[in-house]
UniProtKB/Swiss-Prot annotation:
Alphabetical GO biological process terms: DNA-templated transcription termination; transcription antitermination
GO molecular function: RNA binding
Cysteine disulfide partners in this protein: none
Protein name per UniProt: Transcription antitermination protein NusB
Length: 160
């Protein structure tokens, strides 16, 4: 990775990465608390510096891309049954969706929601691999890579 490719070198990219991390956290919170996506989004905006602007302020980390954050959280909650079915089709038999760590489940749901959007799948996969490495130190990132790669190939072949 060159300096210009690094997330910190591009404030817009960095704000999108932060939005994805926040979305995974929000989806986890929705599942654990039973709160609606709208309630959790509101809490994140009030308490976790989620805003509609994304710029560096005297070297501080930029805020998350609010639009992307909301799209992911609301999109996943609205399409969760479809997303879960796609995940269940590719998960190893010994790892059904309910058995997965709740953070891993939230991460996969967010990533699957974004696959097939205007953002190239390779970027989505790389972003969520980075997020997975932030949350997990074991084999989970490898699992994320395999699952997302399979779903991306299926989507591009029209088999999803």
């Amino acid at each position: 990775m060159t300096v210009t490719d690094a997330p910190s070198a591009n404030p817009t990219r960095r704000s999108r990465t932060i939005a994805r991390v926040a979305a995974v956290q929000a989806l986890f919170q929705c599942e654990q608390s039973g709160d609606t996506a709208e309630t959790v989004i509101s809490q994140f905006i009030r308490h976790r510096r989620i805003s509609s602007t994304a710029s560096f302020d005297d070297g501080h980390i930029p805020d998350a891309d609010l639009k992307l954050f909301q799209e992911i959280v609301l999109g996943v909650t609205r399409r969760q049954d479809d997303i879960d079915a796609k995940l269940s089709d590719v998960l190893p038999e010994q790892w059904p969706l309910p058995r997965l760590d709740p953070v891993l489940r939230a991460l996969l749901r967010a990533a699957v929601f974004e696959i097939g959007t205007d953002t190239p799948d390779r970027i989505i996969i790389n972003e969520y691999l980075d997020v997975a490495h932030g949350f997990f130190s074991g084999d989970e990132p490898k699992m994320v890579n395999g699952i997302l790669d399979t779903l991306s190939r299926r989507a591009n072949d029209g088999n999803v």
